[in-house]
């Protein structure tokens, strides 16, 4: 399983984003919720980031992936200068991975994974939870032999890309949730020719097995607002390592099955946030 932070909105400088990444590093290094729920206190199976900056109709992007543990690498040194250069519209997704048992640990399976949609757009995904990989193979048009090199998130993103053209709709996400095994805390970014479509949210299955309390503590996602910037973060990041810029009163837990969609245009315009309440 994994820890992640996401951001969307407008920034004057990247310091808040840098500090949020630092908190993610701490959460990946020592995760009390992971220890409680999965007996995993570290997320050491690679990390990655997608950062998109839009200013004056100019778009810049950084996509980085590494199989090193995020807390043994230098994420602030690698992506920090880019974050600090941002001065307007931004989308950020940063992910620290703890691979599920039996899943490959390689650069292909390190998030954010990438695919090309039917319409020629780029589709990126980060994910905490697991999909039923076998059920997605046909939709992804991938053989079992080839699929063995990739994790469930890669196959899920590829299957979603095969389904869509140049946007991610509510029905598309509902379809994807029908293939969830344990949970789908997600960040999805679709990069089109003149806009970015971004979705963030949380879903996890409750099993009534006496462990739903620990399950909720592990899977819950916070939404925090700082000026014109909205940050989404895994529970450990906020409950145990909350950055000083993220006031507790400005953070809330999003509902199980709640997803938010944003559309950001290359001219700097941002459309009003859409809220989707989905269930299986």
Regions found by a protein language model. Name each.
Residues 1-280:
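N-terminal segments that mediate ammonia production and transfer
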């Amino acid at each position: 399983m994994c820890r992640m932070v996401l951001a969307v909105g407008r920034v004057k400088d990247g310091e808040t984003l840098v500090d949020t990444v630092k908190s993610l590093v701490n959460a990946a290094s020592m995760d009390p919720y992971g220890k409680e729920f999965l007996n995993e206190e570290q997320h050491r199976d690679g990390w990655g980031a997608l950062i998109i900056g839009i200013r004056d109709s100019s778009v810049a992007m950084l996509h980085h992936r590494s199989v090193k543990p995020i807390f043994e690498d230098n994420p602030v040194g690698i992506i920090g200068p880019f974050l600090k250069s941002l001065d307007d519209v931004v989308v950020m997704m940063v992910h620290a991975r703890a691979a599920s048992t039996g899943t490959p640990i390689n650069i292909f399976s390190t998030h954010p994974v990438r695919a090309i949609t039917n319409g020629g757009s780029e589709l990126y995904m980060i994910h905490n939870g697991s999909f039923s990989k076998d059920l997605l193979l046909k939709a992804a048009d991938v053989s079992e032999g080839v699929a063995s090199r990739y994790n469930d998130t890669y196959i899920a993103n590829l299957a979603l890309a095969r389904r869509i053209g140049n946007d991610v709709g509510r029905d598309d996400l509902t379809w994807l949730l029908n293939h969830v095994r344990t949970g789908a805390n997600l960040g999805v970014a679709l990069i089109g020719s003149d806009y970015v479509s971004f979705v963030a949210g949380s879903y996890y299955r409750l099993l009534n097995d006496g462990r739903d309390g620990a399950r909720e503590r592990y899977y819950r996602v916070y939404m925090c607002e700082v000026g014109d910037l909205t940050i989404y973060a895994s529970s450990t990041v906020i409950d145990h390592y909350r950055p000083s810029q993220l006031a507790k009163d400005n953070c809330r837990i999003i509902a199980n099955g709640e997803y938010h969609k944003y559309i950001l245009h290359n001219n700097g315009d941002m459309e009003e946030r859409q809220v989707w309440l989905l269930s299986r």
